[in-house]
């Protein structure tokens, strides 16, 4: 009597997954816009207000709206699943739900797509601040590259891990120079020259792999 509602459930859940992906983009912007990070932020027009009480604020209102609307779309997944079982394939308990669910979820996702497109198109990015934040680690972000360099030269991975970790912890806990400590470490120097260690302390090769995937 009626079309099986699993098709409708698949459609609604697909919308929910898309909404979740867009919300992930928006959530990343929200984190990057935090005062202590500020590596990227939403476009902020000259006459825009970030807060009615605090004139200095530049709240990521568009990103927050995207995240909120995504929850709404994803919330329709439950009634979509509950619509699948029908009495003898002929009752219309699904109808009242679908009259709200399908148009609302569809138009909401359309709105989220438009908002996310505008967010990305106008996104303000601050590479200098990104580099500044990277440098705050004192080179600790390069520990994986040092580890891989040691392994490529024949060191056992677990052993090399301990060598790199002990020098990294000196930086983390005592503020010592990570690079200099590696250069002074007799175990590390058995496998890597000072120049080879220095080559590990370069962020540019770390950007290549993401670009390949994009």
Mark where each language-model region is.
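A short hydrophobic/aromatic micro-motif that marks alpha-helical segments and, especially, helix-coil
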Residues: 74, 169-172, 190
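C-terminal alpha-helical interaction appendages
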Residues: 123-185
């Amino acid at each position: 009597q009626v079309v099986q509602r699993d098709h409708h459930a698949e459609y609604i859940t697909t919308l929910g997954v898309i909404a979740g992906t867009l919300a992930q983009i928006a959530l990343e912007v929200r984190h990057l816009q935090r005062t202590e990070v500020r590596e990227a932020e939403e476009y902020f027009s000259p006459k825009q207000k970030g807060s009615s009480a605090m004139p200095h604020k530049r709240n990521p209102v568009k990103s927050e709206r995207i995240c909120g609307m995504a929850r709404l779309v994803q919330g329709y997944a439950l009634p979509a699943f509950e619509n699948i079982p029908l009495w003898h394939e002929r009752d219309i308990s699904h109808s009242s739900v679908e009259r709200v669910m399908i148009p609302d979820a569809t138009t909401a996702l359309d709105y989220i797509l438009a908002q996310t497109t505008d967010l990305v198109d106008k996104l303000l990015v601050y590479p200098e601040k990104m580099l500044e934040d990277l440098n705050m680690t004192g080179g600790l972000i390069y520990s994986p590259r040092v580890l891989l360099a040691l392994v490529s030269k024949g060191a056992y991975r677990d052993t090399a891990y301990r060598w790199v970790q002990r020098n990294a912890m000196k930086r983390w806990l005592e503020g010592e120079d990570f690079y200099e400590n590696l250069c002074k470490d007799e175990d590390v120097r058995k496998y890597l020259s000072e120049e080879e260690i220095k080559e590990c302390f370069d962020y540019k090769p770390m950007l290549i792999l993401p670009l390949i995937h994009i």
